[in-house]
Swiss-Prot record:
Taxonomy of the source species: Eukaryota, Metazoa, Ecdysozoa, Arthropoda, Chelicerata
Tissues expressed in: Expressed by the venom gland.
Protein name according to UniProt: Venom peptide isomerase light chain
Subcellular localization(s) per the UniProt record: Secreted
Function as written in the Swiss-Prot or TrEMBL entry: Acts cofactor-independently.
A cellular component annotation (GO) from this entry: extracellular region
Regions annotated as coiled coil: none
Major site of localization recorded for this protein: secreted
GO function term, MF aspect, one: isomerase activity
Keywords on record: Disulfide bond, Isomerase, Secreted
Record flagged with keyword Lipoprotein: no
Oligomeric and partner information: Heterodimer with venom peptide isomerase heavy chain; disulfide-linked.
Top-level taxon: Eukaryota
């Protein structure tokens, strides 16, 4: 469960334009 959360956060950060 924790791993999935981390992956989701990373994907959101990558998808979000800086």
């Amino acid at each position: 469960v924790e791993v999935a959360t981390v992956k989701n956060c990373g994907k959101k950060l990558l998808a979000t334009p800086r």
